[in-house]
Design a protein with these regions (language model features):
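ATP-binding glycine-rich loop module of kinase domains
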Residues: 2-32
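The N-lobe alphaC helix and its flanking beta3-alphaC-beta4 segment of protein kinase-like domains
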Residues: 29-45
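Conserved short submotifs of the Hanks-type protein kinase catalytic core
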Residues: 60-73
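Conserved kinase catalytic-core helix
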Residues: 75-110, 128, 134
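Active-site Asp-x-Gly
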Residues: 157-171
Length: 171
């Protein structure tokens, strides 16, 4: 296994055609399993995303196993080719629009997630009430929301196919 990325609490390894995302003890088992479940549910849309291959414990750490997608992130391509930034941004926006056309009814709802965050905030009760009322006044829909959609979460394969990664915050 080759370590290819490390961030606070997480390590990414490449093992042939598999990617292993290993979490430290600061991540809850429920959160890790939820990330795998989110990704499995989004797989059913037909969007290009890495397939979930398994959830396991490796060296005492919970780990998710996905198919490895060969390519560069859109963020890397933007840095390597600044003259193409407008083209890449148009591509990124088109991908966002395509993603928002999908429906994944088994995912949690963003509205519920925001209500929980408001309720658990330290704001005074009157501010929390106002935020809840404003949230309830927004239009209701069931569009797929990635939750962390940014150029670093889009991998472009050598043939130009985009794959969207990191579905831990999807609703």
């Amino acid at each position: 296994m080759e370590l290819i990325h490390e961030s606070v609490g997480k390590k990414l390894y490449r093992d042939g055609d598999r990617l292993i995302k290993s979490f430290d003890e600061s991540y809850s088992k429920a959160g890790i399993l939820n990330e795998a479940l989110n990704q499995a549910r989004v797989e059913e849309t037909g969007l290009n995303i890495p397939k979930v291959l398994g959830v396991t414990v490796v060296d005492g750490r919970w780990s998710l196993i996905w198919e490895y997608i060969e390519g560069e992130t859109l963020e890397s391509l933007m840095q390597m080719h600044p003259e193409k930034e407008d083209e890449y941004l148009d591509f990124f926006v088109d991908l966002q629009i395509r993603m928002s056309e999908e429906r994944v009814p088994l995912l949690g709802h963003l509205r519920d997630k925001m209500h929980m965050k408001i309720s658990s905030s330290a704001y005074p009760a009157t501010v929390r009430y106002d935020l809840h009322m404003r949230l309830d006044g927004l239009p209701r829909h069931n569009k797929l929301c990635h939750g962390d959609f940014q150029p670093s979460n889009v991998v472009i394969t050598p043939d130009g196919t985009p794959y969207i990664i990191d579905w831990s915050h999807a609703t």
